Design a protein with these regions (language model features):
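Outer-pore turret/helix-boundary of cation channels
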Residues: 228-271
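Pore domain of cation channels
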Residues: 259-321
């Protein structure tokens, strides 16, 4: 069935089952849609103005490969509406209510949300491309909003870039709604996805940024990296030489002469102690670096100052937010 009426106003659609219908070049004004099911329907160049798709305990369902092309929902109530297995392209939600609406297994292409109420919105197991917010005021989001891991085509670099941009847009909008913890998680996801699209020096820089502090969102990463540096330098000091109370620890020489007389655990703990005080720039002076260890200790002190600053800044940022 094809609907080619140019305009419908003040019409109530109650508990209908629309199957394989095509709605084209139609303007719905002040209409009420109550408990309707749209299956395998096509909506093309259709505008809904001041329409209501919600009554308590009666929701509208769009499912089974419904297609939306060049659609506008303006000042509509789509609360609790369900969009399942649909293709949604060039669709605009303007000053509408999408509270607790569910989008499941949908393909979303080049869609826009402007000044809408999206509290409790769920997007599950879907592919999203070019999804953006264009607000004069602020689209409302809350802690119950859930955007599932977005599907992407791993064969195309552009797919990673688009998904990263979507996550960044969501993060920015959550931050505007003072949902800082949620915003930081979506920002972290955006950076992880963006990392996969990078090459060369940009990818190296991104990897370092991730290892150091999880793109500024993971203070524990800075702590773990610091511990790895301390342990790594402790091992190096065992082979480059330290003077401990007149005794020299240098396992390059030990391997050449008499290994059996050395207490490896005690020597390693001494090197670990020296590495720790060097990294934290405390330095009690009871252990003296020898030969190459002097140069290594200078490097470790610089890394210690840097990592302490990164860890402190990242932790403070998370706490204050």
């Amino acid at each position: 069935m094809i609907f080619l009426i140019t305009e419908l106003g003040n019409v109530e659609f109650d508990k209908n089952n629309f199957k394989r219908c095509k709605f084209k070049d139609i303007i719905f004004k002040d209409c009420i849609f109550n408990a309707n099911v749209f299956s395998k329907c096509i909506f093309e160049n259709v505008s809904f103005e001041n329409c209501r798709f919600y009554k308590p305990d009666n929701i509208n369902i769009f499912s089974d490969e419904c297609i939306f092309m060049k659609i506008i929902f303006k000042n509509c109530n789509l609360e609790n509406s369900v969009f399942k297995e649909c293709r949604i392209s060039d669709l605009k939600f303007i000053e509408s209510t999408l509270e607790h609406a569910i989008f499941s297994n949908v393909l979303i292409e080049n869609n826009q949300i402007s000044d809408c109420d999206c509290r409790g919105l769920k997007i599950i197991n879907s592919t999203i491309e070019k999804f953006r917010f264009e607000d004069k005021n602020i689209t409302k989001l809350d802690e119950y909003v859930f955007i599932d891991t977005i599907k992407l085509d791993k064969k195309y670099k552009k797919s990673y870039e688009e998904v990263a941009r979507v996550y960044k847009n969501i993060s920015k909008k959550l931050e505007e709604n003072n949902l800082i913890n949620h915003a930081s998680e979506y920002y972290y996801l955006s950076k992880c996805i963006e990392h996969k699209s990078l090459t060369g020096i940009d990818k190296i820089n991104s990897t370092i940024y991730w290892l150091l502090c999880g793109y500024g969102e993971r203070p524990t990463y800075a702590l773990i990296t610091s511990l790895e540096i301390i342990f790594g330098f402790a091992v190096l000091y065992m082979f480059t030489g330290l003077s401990i109370s007149g005794n020299v620890v240098n396992y390059v020489e030990v391997f050449s002469y008499n290994f059996s007389e050395r207490n490896v655990v005690t020597d390693f703990m001494s090197c670990l102690y020296f590495s720790t005080v060097t990294f934290t720039t405390v330095g009690y002076g009871d252990i003296t670096p020898l030969n190459l260890s002097v140069f290594l200790s200078a490097i470790e002190m610089f890394l210690g100052l840097t990592m302490t600053g990164i860890w402190t800044a990242t932790l403070a940022r998370k706490i204050t937010r």
